[in-house]
C-alpha cells in the first residue's frame, strides 16, 4: 500500500497520514507516504486531498473518508479492534463533516457534541485507538477554526483528548513529516528576491524618487514596502529620496497623522533627503488648471455625483463638456471663493467620455472643500485631486521615477496624459505589487471605519496591519525591514500568509528574549512536595540558557508549588515527571473533585532522576507571595475570510471574537519588565509587555511566531 498527500489541500489529510504511520510503527505493515506540492492530486476530483494505492489495484482510492475506511478494512485489528465497525465509521463520517466546516455556529455545535461524548471516555470508541480517533484528530488539525476553538479550553474533555492524541508517536511523526515536506517545498521554490531589476533610463547620481503618503491615517505595512522600495532605488543610484505629503483633502487629513507618519518613516530607518508638501504648490497647480481650461482641455461641470458616475460608466458625455472657456474660468473663480455656485461645480479634464479605460473618462481635477486645511487654514477653498496634482509636483520637484503599485495600473495612462497635456518633463512610471495579507484589510477607508466604530482600540491596535499596530504586537523594526526587503521589487500580485512575516521576527527575538515562567491561574493545582525545602529559597538562574549576556533571574523554590490543570490531568499515579529547571519528581497522590478536575497533588522529588527518560516536562511556580498576576492577551484576525472578492462587504466577515485573555501567575522577574520588553513565557510563546506591573497585574501581548495556532486556529 502507498499513500499520496496533497500539501496544499483544504483540508489536509492529516488523519490518513497518521494512520499510515500508526501501521508502520506497529509493525503491522509497511506503507510509503509521498507528499506532493499541489492542492489536489486529481484536478477533476475535489476529494483528492489524499489517495491510497493498494497493492495489485489498478486505481487509487481518493479522499480522507474513503482512505480511513480503507485502513479499517485492510487493518481491522488496528483500527476497529473488538468494537462495532459501524460505530467507528460513524465517527469517521462526523470527521468528514467537521474537516471542511467553517460555519461558526455549526462548528460550535459539532465541537460541543464531541466534548459531551468524551465526558466519561478517554477515546471515541472502546479502550484503544481506532480510525475514529485518527479521523477526528485529523479533521480538527486541518480545520484551523476548530483546532483553535479547542485550544481555548472551552471544550475541556475534547482538549484533554486532543492533547493526548498530540502525544502519540504516530501523530508526532506525522507532523514532523509534514513540516519537513513543506520546508523542502519552500526551499525548492525560494530563489530570493531579484534586486537587480533596474529602473529605465536611470543615470547614477540623477535618480529622484518620492514616497507620497496622504496624511489621513497611519502607515500600514503596504506603505512601508513603498517607502523602503523608494529608498532602495534612491540609494542604489546615489540619488535623492523625497517624502511628500499629498495633503489636498482637508476632509480626511490632519497634523496628527502627518507627525505619526514622519515618526514611522524614521522608525523604518528611512532618511529622506527632503520632506515636502503638495499644499506648498497649490498656487502653481491652480495656474496649471487655468491653463488647461484656456487650452480647451478642461471644463467646469455641475453634474451631480450620481449622474456623473452613471454617465462615466455608460460613456455618456456631460451636458457641459463643450461649455465656453470664459464660462468655465468664471466658475473656477467662484470655486476659489467657495460660493454657492462654486460649491455645485468641479473642474474636469476633457480627455474622452468613452475611453475603454474608465479612469480616462473626463476625470475630476479640481473640487471645492470649505473645511480648514491643517497647514493653510482657510486660504484655499478649492483643491486639486491627486491625479492632477501628482504629475505636476513630481515634475516640479525633479522626480525621475514614480514608483506606483499595480493597483494604479489603470490610472497610469492618465498620469502620462497629464504630463503631455501640460507639457511637463517626462517621468518614468515603475510598477510594483503591493503587499496583501490573508484575512487583512489594508484599505485606509475600511481601517478608518473600523477605528471609528470602536471595533479596535485605535490605529496602534495590535490587530491592525499598521506599522504601529504590528510594533505593538511585538514586531521588531529590524524584522519588519528584513521581511519587506525579502519580498523584493516584484510586480507579481500575491496574497501573503502572515506565517513568514512573524517567523522572520522570531529569528530576531528568540536569541535575546529572556525566559520566564507562568501558570494559568484558572483551576490551578497546588502540589505539595513531601520532601521539598522546609522554607522557600531563591537561586540565580540564567535568563536565557544560550545567551549569558542577558544575566540571571531569581528562581524561587518551595515545598508548595502551582501546576496547570492540563498538566495535572495528564499525570499518572507514581509517574516520574520533570519539573523544568528543578529536577524530576514522582507523582505520589492525585486528588480530584466530582467533575474529574484535579484539586491537589503530592509529589516526591527525585533530583537524581534522568530528565531524558521522562515523558512530561512541566512548568511550575512556587506558591509564595512573590507570584505575579499577569494578563496574557492573544488576538485573532479581524475578518474570517482569506481574501474578499469584488463586491463583498468586510462587515459580513467580521470575526466574532478577536481578543482573548488568560490570567496567569508568573515569576517575580515579571515585575521588573518595562513597556515594550519582549520575553518568552516557557511553553506558552513570545510576549511583549504592553502594561508593566503596576502593583496589581501586568499585561502582555502574545507575539505570533509563524507556527503557533491562534484562536479559531488561525496561523499568524
Curated annotation (Swiss-Prot):
EC number of the protein: 6.1.1.17
Residue ranges of the motif 'HIGH' region: 215-224
InterPro entries: aa-tRNA-synth_I_CS (IPR001412), Gln/Glu-tRNA_Ligase (IPR050132), Glu-tRNA-synth_arc/euk (IPR004526), Glu/Gln-tRNA-synth (IPR000924), Glu/Gln-tRNA-synth_Ib_cat-dom (IPR020058), Glu/Gln-tRNA-synth_Ib_codon-bd (IPR020059), Glu_tRNA_lig_a-bdl (IPR020061), Glutathione-S-Trfase_C_sf (IPR036282)
Binding site for L-glutamate: 210-212, 246, 386-390, 404
Presence of the UniProt keyword Aminoacyl-tRNA synthetase in the record: yes
Residue numbers of Phosphoserine PTMs: 190
Function according to Swiss-Prot or TrEMBL: Catalyzes the attachment of glutamate to tRNA(Glu) in a two-step reaction: glutamate is first activated by ATP to form Glu-AMP and then transferred to the acceptor end of tRNA(Glu).
Name of this protein: Probable glutamate--tRNA ligase, cytoplasmic
